[in-house]
Amino acid sequence: MSNVSKNEMLVGVDIGTSKIVAIVAETRGDGLIEIIGLGTFPSKGLKNGVVVDIESTTQAIKKSIAEAESMAGCHIGSCYVGISGSHIRGLNSEGVVPIRDGEVRYGDVDRVIETAQAMAIPADQKLLHVLPRDYIIDKQDGIKEPLGMAGSRLEAKVHLVTCSENSSQNIHKCISASGLDVESFVLEQLASSYSVLTSDERDLGV
């Protein structure tokens, strides 16, 4: 088997209550992604997206990964992990920063997002995603892409997605026990939206 190159391969593991699904995708030169490996195995170690049996969940992950490796003809060393469940939380936040050079640059956007996500998150929750909803420049709202725009004050309205710290740690333990590294956790609903919706549809809240 050949080693998976992070530049060419993407591996996702969907930790579901009824089954574990592992997918290996290859990025092509034209920007499209092709599924080259798929593995599934029944899961009995989770309930409502929460691990209730680490050993059972670990074995299901191993089985699904082995099947995906066999189909793709590669070795999987790391993966993105889909996460869902009743422990997922969402809240809105805002941030404000001065525009340093009179024109919005990447650094300004990074700073305003950091400011927006600095709000207090419960100790038992872990930040998953910071999703920009809207930008405001000098009280002009409705801005979707602020880069290059002139102004002195940049605001950002964002949606923060969090998950249970304990739940994510237990899933991480199962992935690690399966011999894999976790690239990051991804909200399953968000991943699904990117696979089936256009950017305009996501902006409209479809």
Where do the protein language model's features map onto the residues?
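Nucleotide/phosphate-binding catalytic cleft detector across ATP-hydrolyzing
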Residues: 1-17, 23-206
